[in-house]
Amino acid sequence: MIPATGPLVSTEWLAAHLADPDMVVFDATIYLPTEAKDGAAEFVACHIPGARFFDIDEIADPDTELPHMVPASGRFARLMGDLGVSNSSFCVFYDQKGLFSASRGWWMMGLFGHDRAAVLDGGLPKWQMEARTVEAGDPPPVAPARFRPDFRASRLRGIGDMLENVDSEEALVLDARAGARFRAEAPEPRAGMRSGHIPGSANLPYNDLLATDQTMLPPDRLRARLAEAGIDGSRPVITSCGTGVTATILTLAMVRAGFAPGAVYDGSWTEWGSRPDTPLET
C-alpha cells in the first residue's frame, strides 16, 4: 500500500509511484468561461501516463443551475467507482495550469471521507518541464470498483450558513478571487452577477500562495501569508471564490501550513452575487 503523504506530492514522488497498483492519477482541469479551452479535449491531447479525467462538471449535482456543486454521496460513490476508485486507492490530482483546479478533486475526496489523496505540486507544466513521459488519446477502460463514502458535513457550507455567519461573524471567510474582483473593480467572468464580496470577508488571492512556477509556497511562507489574512487558529475558516474551485487552493494551503481544513462555501460568489437578496460590500 502506498504510504500516507502530505496534501502535496512532488513530480519525483509521483514518477516513483506511478506504477503502484493502488495509484490512480486524475487530470482535474477546468477552464473559466472566458478561456477558449476544454479540459477534457486537452487531456486527450496530452496527459500523464495512466491518468484518467476527473470531470468536475460531471462529478457534481445535476439538479442545480449552479456550476459543479457537490453531488449527493450516492452519486459521488457511483461515479468514483466507475472511474476505478476504491477505498484503498491513492488518488493524485493534477491540472494543466499548474495548480488551479486539481485541489477541487483533492478536497472532494476528503469531503467524502477519503484521505488517501494528494495534489501534484506544479501539475502538468512542471511534469513536462522536466521532460517526463506523457501520452495522448482516450484512456483505456478501467475495471469498476466499489467506493464507500463517509460524508463530512463540517467541511461544506451553503448559503444559509453564510447568511448566518454575516451576522454572527463566527468564522473568518477567505475569498480566493483576485483583488480587483473582490473590490468590485473588475467584472465577474460570468454574466449577470453583481460585483463585490461577502460582508466581513477577507481577500487572499490564491495566486499569492503560489511560486512563479505554479508550485505551492513552503509551509513557513504559507503560514506568513495566512497570518496576514487573519488566520491564527482562533476562529474557524470558510473559504470562497467564484465557483468553489480555487477556494480549495486556500484549503490546501491551510492544511499544508498545519491548520485544520475548515469549510468551503460551495456556491461561492456565483451563488452569492447572482441573488438580489444577499448583502455585499465593495
Residue ranges and their predicted role:
Residues M1-T282:
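Cytosolic catalytic domains that perform sulfur/thiol-centered chemistry
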